[in-house]
Curated annotation (Swiss-Prot):
Species: Enterocytozoon bieneusi (strain H348) (Microsporidian parasite)
Cofactor binding description: Binds 2 divalent metal cations per subunit.
Cofactor(s) demanded: a divalent metal cation
Its EC number(s): 3.1.21.-
Xref: CDD domains: TatD_DNAse (cd01310)
This protein's UniProt keywords: Hydrolase, Metal-binding, Nuclease, Nucleus
Name of the protein in its database record: Putative deoxyribonuclease TATDN1 homolog
Amino acid sequence: MSISYNVFDIAVNPTYYSFEKLKLIVEKAKELKILPLFIGLDMETNIQVIHLSKMQQTLCYCGIHPTHINTLYKENNIWNILDIVQADLKQLFVENSEYIIAIGECGLDYYRNQLKIEQQRIFKMQLELSYLNIPYFLHMRNAFDDFYNIIKNYTNVTGVIHSFDGTVDQALALINLGFYIGINGCSLKNNIDLVKNIPIDKILVETDSPFCLIRKSYAGAEYGKVLKVKENEPVYILNLIEIISNIKQMPIQQLIHQFKLNTIKCFPQLKKFQ
């Protein structure tokens, strides 16, 4: 995997595609020097994305997504298995360190899942693995206050808050803690203020394929081409970067170069693709 890439799509959900479709979209992306990075969502999909990363010659993240915590427990037994799940995650990282570049996707989601206490416990359990010196691929939706109050206590945790749809002030507060902000089509749904106002050296770009296309009704749509496709895929990250360049009034190639540097700083294992 020593090929050089120009763009890293930091968020691709491979388990939502058939194997044949995944193979096709990865090949298309790599032809354009785009490397898709795969997301694990729970213990089952973590195993799958490691396997798919090996098959597709890419890298991945492994963790427990806040909306997938129901896969960990029946009734109220979650408190009895946190140590077991933490140990299982650690074993995954140790045994597959060549392919796993971050812990995640993990975080808090109060939009789709109201099990707030359970989410917080599972989030903290994963943050306690920071002694492994692995970056984090983080999720935060409708949960800024609790997310911030938890994450600020883990001063050795680094990484990106992906698919960011919060406010400019929230983004800047997280940037001040040392985090990067992941931008995709959903970040441009209601307004362009976020993209317009956060520094380019703190932005990572993503498609969150097959989700988060920029739709005609989105605020960001007037700054570029709206793709007439049903599903997102990694090659469309170039469309996202073009829209960001129009919003920020900066050359596309300058942004591509900066976003590549940012991603490598966030995930040092990507240095092999410089």
